[in-house]
Amino acid sequence: MWVLILLLAGMPPVLCIDISMHPDAFGVVGKSIKLKCSFTSSYPISDIVAVDWTYRQLNGGSTVTILHFQNKPYPILEGPFKDRIIWEGDVRRGDASISLTDLRLTDNGTLSCIVWNPPDVHGNVPQTKLTVTIENLFFQFNTVILLSALVFIPSALVSLLLLIRMRRSINRGRTKNLKWRKKSPIEESQDCVYDDNENTPLHPTLPQEQSPGCFMKFCLRCLDDSDED
């Protein structure tokens, strides 16, 4: 309705610049983190486009500007992020991102990205909550265990397969040797069976209950003959 009234009155409407940031960012002490800020404007990006990054501590306090950009970045010379801010943006592409280096636990707080592109100077002011923590030793320990498992388990499986193949090869060799091994005369005599009616040895396959061998039967016959005498 107001846009229609302004158009009818011959006045150009005031459009808002749209700025986007991720609501949360998580960093680790001593590491770096990139804080993304993107924007779109209803007007072409001009040479006088300006960006301000502000910071407020988590426990409250005043909001301070930590970086100002206009044609080039101007980081703060004093304050919590002195010498730890890097401009990562490209305003021509609607990017106003920065990076924070050497994070500290005292960096926890809220950061905002504000962009002006005259005459488009009105817009939302989003915020990112920065949370910095000490790297979890438990996570490091789990990572070491995982990497060790990825190396050990395949090696153990390969070793097990090799042992199984070696055992099967040894068993096949033993079976082959037993099959082709020549029996001694004593073993041959134990395999033969005497016919009770004849003195000639027979060589059929042994029954389930093994009968006395030839030599043993001959000895038994000798004992029987001596008893009769």
From Swiss-Prot:
Compartment annotation: Membrane
Topology in membrane: Single-pass type I membrane protein
Chief place of localization: membrane
A cellular component term, taken from the record's GO annotations: plasma membrane
InterPro entries listed in its UniProt record: Ig-like_dom (IPR007110), Ig-like_dom_sf (IPR036179), Ig-like_fold (IPR013783), Ig_sub (IPR003599), Ig_V-set (IPR013106), Myelin_P0-rel (IPR000920)
UniProt record, GO biological process: cell adhesion
Ig-like V-type domain: residues covered: 17-131
Keyword line: Cell adhesion, Disulfide bond, Glycoprotein, Immunoglobulin domain, Membrane, Signal, Transmembrane, Transmembrane helix
Signal peptide positions (record): 1-16
Extracellular domain ranges by topology: 17-143
Positions annotated as glycosylated: 108
Disulphide linkage map: 37-113
Membrane side Cytoplasmic: residue ranges: 165-229
Any Pfam family matching the protein: V-set
Family: Belongs to the myelin P0 protein family.
Main function: Mediates homophilic cell-cell adhesion.
Official protein name in the record: Myelin protein zero-like protein 3
Species assigned in the record: Xenopus laevis
